[in-house]
Amino acid sequence: MNILLTGGGTGGHLAIAKALMESLASKNQSLFFIGSQRGQDRSWFEHEEGFKRRFFLETQGVVNQRGIAKIRSLSSQFQAMLEARKILKNHQIKRVVSVGGYSAAPASLAALSLGIPLYIHEQNAKVGLLNRLLKPFSRAFLSSYDSNSLIRDYPVRDAFFEVARVRSRVKKILFLGGSQGAKAINDWALELAPLIHQRGIAIMHQCGEVDYERMKRGYEERSIPVELFAFDRAIHQKMQQADLAISRAGASSLWELGANGLPALFIPYPFAAGDHQYYNAKFILDQGLGWMVRQENLSTEVLLEILEEDLSQKSECLMAYVKRGAADRMADFILS
């Protein structure tokens, strides 16, 4: 069957697309992808052999635009939708699966206009505008936060489960700023570094490409040993080494940490659309599976309290809560 995956913009959306691609490819399906020329879509999938064809259309986000910029964004989305219609027809696509993000709009709307079944995965606890609009017209709407969802497990790649382990005491901390880094987390890491080092705890830090040189100087000036990196696609290998993560609350990071059994202190990005990272972290907090602090409330005391805890119960509960095989269950559902 010819199936098209669409969506992206950020690593969170694209991680879901990759997990679904791997599962559907293992079931001998012919896969196609439509993303955007902007964002990270091209860097993730331009050379991805799991897709038979990959298309990157000229689109940009609409939600945060105003005035003329919003009109231009809507116009680019409409033109891209017309291109997507041609792609779907030319390649006889039978299913379209959206993983969200502004780059999902053209192919999703094209699918509905052509009567092709549309499946939507919502990665966040707070439903995005596009998915909210398309949900009533979709064949199925899947969400890990929705009690009415037919599949509630989050599609995390097997690699994160394969290196999972139970943590107890903190010997190494991993700072995670998401696929693009986070200046607030970077700054807090430098503030905490002397205290962490004094306690004999090792530091790993994913700081993003833009802030890499500044962070490198910052650790050197403090004479703090650190494993510093801008970004790593094999982030599961970094997680496996850590005992505690300090992270943004993007959905994929949140569930990947859970699959790995790695307890985390979440610092939601305060300017995320609809404050969705706060609601993502709150969902985990409400299950008793992690910690959360608002960016404006960061303090040394927050970390000190966690360092005194035995993490084994949270770690074990995370591993039990996040189920393996969600991508396969979603793939089977889409093919049924």
From Swiss-Prot:
Keywords: Cell cycle, Cell division, Cell inner membrane, Cell membrane, Cell shape, Cell wall biogenesis/degradation, Glycosyltransferase, Membrane, Peptidoglycan synthesis, Transferase
Enzyme Commission number(s) from the entry: 2.4.1.227
Pathway: Cell wall biogenesis; peptidoglycan biosynthesis
SUPFAM superfamilies linked to this entry: UDP-Glycosyltransferase/glycogen phosphorylase
Listed GO MF terms: UDP-N-acetyl-D-glucosamine:N-acetylmuramoyl-L-alanyl-D-glutamyl-meso-2,6-diaminopimelyl-D-alanyl-D-alanine-diphosphoundecaprenol 4-beta-N-acetylglucosaminlytransferase activity; undecaprenyldiphospho-muramoylpentapeptide beta-N-acetylglucosaminyltransferase activity
Compartments where found: Cell inner membrane
Keyword Kinase on entry: no
GO cellular component: plasma membrane
UniProt: UDP-N-acetyl-alpha-D-glucosamine binding residues: T10, G11, G12, N124, R157, S179, Q277
GO biological process: carbohydrate metabolic process; cell division; cell wall organization; lipid glycosylation; peptidoglycan biosynthetic process; regulation of cell shape
Reactions catalysed according to its record: di-trans,octa-cis-undecaprenyl diphospho-N-acetyl-alpha-D-muramoyl-L-alanyl-D-glutamyl-meso-2,6-diaminopimeloyl-D-alanyl-D-alanine + UDP-N-acetyl-alpha-D-glucosamine = di-trans,octa-cis-undecaprenyl diphospho-[N-acetyl-alpha-D-glucosaminyl-(1->4)]-N-acetyl-alpha-D-muramoyl-L-alanyl-D-glutamyl-meso-2,6-diaminopimeloyl-D-alanyl-D-alanine + UDP + H(+)
Topological relation to the membrane, as annotated: Peripheral membrane protein
Domain of life of the source: Bacteria
CDD domains in alphabetical order: GT28_MurG
InterPro entries: GlcNAc_MurG (IPR006009), Glyco_trans_28_C (IPR007235), GlycoTrans_28_N (IPR004276)
Family affiliation: Belongs to the glycosyltransferase 28 family. MurG subfamily.
Function of the protein: Cell wall formation. Catalyzes the transfer of a GlcNAc subunit on undecaprenyl-pyrophosphoryl-MurNAc-pentapeptide (lipid intermediate I) to form undecaprenyl-pyrophosphoryl-MurNAc-(pentapeptide)GlcNAc (lipid intermediate II).
HAMAP family: MurG (MF_00033)
Database matches in PANTHER family: GLYCOSYLTRANSFERASE, UDP-N-ACETYLGLUCOSAMINE--N-ACETYLMURAMYL-(PENTAPEPTIDE) PYROPHOSPHORYL-UNDECAPRENOL N-ACETYLGLUCOSAMINE TRANSFERASE 1
Name of the protein in its database record: UDP-N-acetylglucosamine--N-acetylmuramyl-(pentapeptide) pyrophosphoryl-undecaprenol N-acetylglucosamine transferase
Origin species: Wolinella succinogenes (strain ATCC 29543 / DSM 1740 / CCUG 13145 / JCM 31913 / LMG 7466 / NCTC 11488 / FDC 602W) (Vibrio succinogenes)
Gene this chain is encoded by: murG
